[in-house]
């Protein structure tokens, strides 16, 4: 009989498509969760202040139209609610900000990174970084509502793959998470958000 072990599988099928990579971290850096044609994936979002000469907002990362609109909504929402979240209300009045979603050669689209982008922008304004293994997904509206997204199973698996054990999901996706098999749900602490205030409270203790 032919015996096939881990080494043989790799020899036949090549290296794994997904590798276990440590999530990025730092001020203005937040880990989101995305669904792709190959399954779930973590989606880091970076925000940085380029200069303070004038107000401005730049997007990069090969983003589709829907994702660009999500970024603009996140920027408008956070910029108009900074004081409520404990940041300088005028921070974005004199800040040229660059928002980037890494792996620039990979096309990205959809609304589910809205809360992630908003959190990266708030992290930048507050000069506060996320120091624990936390990831999030959810569509954000201009008034701060958090709407449901698809691919919850794949996104949860993606979080587990990189060692993340805290998740922020839209409250409307609660049933989707609860329906997952126990072996997928096990070990996660999940926070459900109806509004962006719920997200900020988990991440920064604000709102």
Predicted features along the sequence, with ranges:
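Peripheral, non-AAA+ core regions of ATP-driven protein-machinery
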Residues: 4-9, 15-31, 38-207
